[in-house]
Amino acid sequence: MKRTIAALTMVAVASAAENLIFNDDFNTFNLKTWEHELTLAGGGNWEFEWYVNNRSNSYVKDGVLYIKPTMTEDYIGTQALNSGSINIWGMSPAELCTGPQFYGCERSAAGSGNVNNPIRSARLRTVKSFSTKFGRVEVKAQLPKGDWLWPAIWMLPVSNEFGPWPASGEIDIMESRGNAPGYVAGGHDTFGSTLHWGTNYD
């Protein structure tokens, strides 16, 4: 099971010509460009993953960026997964939790009847290194196969200028699922794109 992004290009569209303003062919993994989110928040959807900055979950090889899920149990053990706590508030900037909402910096399975986030993966963003207002985005990607995988490529606002989500907007360039074709909500043979805006989700 793996997610890959082979290339990402951003082109500014002018009236007469297009100018390349951002490109990454992933010959190297530029961690100044690509910031890792560090959170247990599940994207506001109560997703299963724990987003980390670990080369087991995100790395570059032969011009390809790999985003790979791994089992949390292999990292913290069965007992901690089922009845322990995970605290990622961090003691240094490199380890600092980036998403405190939705209990994103600390989770506990102790006595709750729940388990801690069972999957570790990666979520990368350019919020501190690159943003643009207009242009065309081209992404070359191979989508994963596997139940419960949800690859997505989003454009999110740098700041909530018009208010909290969705008021400041969101462009979902691509979202898909790793499930087999025929899955009721769509499989890895389909994808969707969405625009979010307005005063509320409904």
Kindly label every feature range from the protein language model.
Residues 1-7:
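Sec-dependent signal peptide recognition
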Residues 8-17:
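Hydrophobic h-region of N-terminal signal peptides that target proteins for export
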Residues 17-202:
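GH16 jelly-roll
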